[in-house]
Every structure is written in structure tokens, then in C-alpha cells.
């Protein structure tokens, strides 16, 4: 109930879970070992899932189970961009990046997994 959900937590969760669902027959270890070209997500799919998860997080906030940072009130496009910029900002390599064609990619599935974990215990998987 004192967990604060940041935009960086949300975008990491969304990206990792989209990839995980795509490879649902794989173990987490196998997913973490996927080649980079298998770990991309389209901006359109990302935004759809982002909104779905954000809506569910708002319900959890109303139920006093979590606290949402003010970033989560931003319009979808801005929330996505802010979250992507912030996730893993203390690391020398990007965790998530969006290219000019709207493809979201990661350089490190392990870091993405690490940052996604903050939201992994809230039963959000069914909304992916």
C-alpha cells in the first residue's frame, strides 16, 4: 500500500510482459536470453497495453493498494516517452529506446526484467 508506481516501472512492466506473452512457452531464463531482434515491440501495441495496465493501476490506487506518481496522469504518448527516458537512466546503456519508426527495443532483457519486477505481484498479467 506504500508502493509508489513510477512511469519507469510501468513502461518496463509493459515492455517485458508483451515480450513474455509473445514467448509464453519459454521460461524466464529463455526469455532473458532472447536475441535483440526478438525483443522489439511496436509503439501501437505498447500504447494499447500501457493504457490497459494504467487503467488497472488506477483501480488499485482507488483501493489504496498502491500510489501512482503524477507521471501516470500524462497523456499516453507523453507517459510512454517519459517512462522510456527514465527507466534505467542510471545505467550506461539504455534499457528501453524508441526509434523513429516507432519500434521500442531493449539492450538488456535482464535490466528490463529487473525494472519490471516492481509491478509483478499485482495480478496485472491478465491485462496484457
Locations of the language-model features?
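Membrane-interfacial terminal anchoring regions of lipid-handling membrane enzymes
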Residues: 1-128
Amino acid at each position: 500500500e506504500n508502493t509508489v508506481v513510477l512511469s519507469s516501472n510501468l513502461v518496463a512492466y509493459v515492455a517485458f510482459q508483451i515480450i513474455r506473452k509473445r514467448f509464453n512457452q519459454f521460461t524466464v531464463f529463455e526469455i532473458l536470453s532472447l536475441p535483440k531482434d526478438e525483443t522489439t515491440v511496436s509503439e501501437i501495441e505498447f500504447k494499447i497495453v500501457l493504457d490497459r495496465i494504467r487503467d488497472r493501476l488506477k483501480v488499485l490506487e482507488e483501493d489504496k493498494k498502491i500510489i501512482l506518481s503524477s507521471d501516470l496522469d500524462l497523456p499516453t504518448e507523453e507517459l510512454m516517452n517519459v517512462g522510456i527516458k527514465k527507466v534505467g537512466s542510471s545505467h550506461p546503456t539504455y534499457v528501453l529506446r524508441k526509434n523513429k519508426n516507432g519500434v521500442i527495443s531493449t539492450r538488456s532483457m535482464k535490466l528490463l526484467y529487473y525494472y519490471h519486477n516492481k509491478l509483478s505481484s499485482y495480478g496485472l498479467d491478465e491485462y496484457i
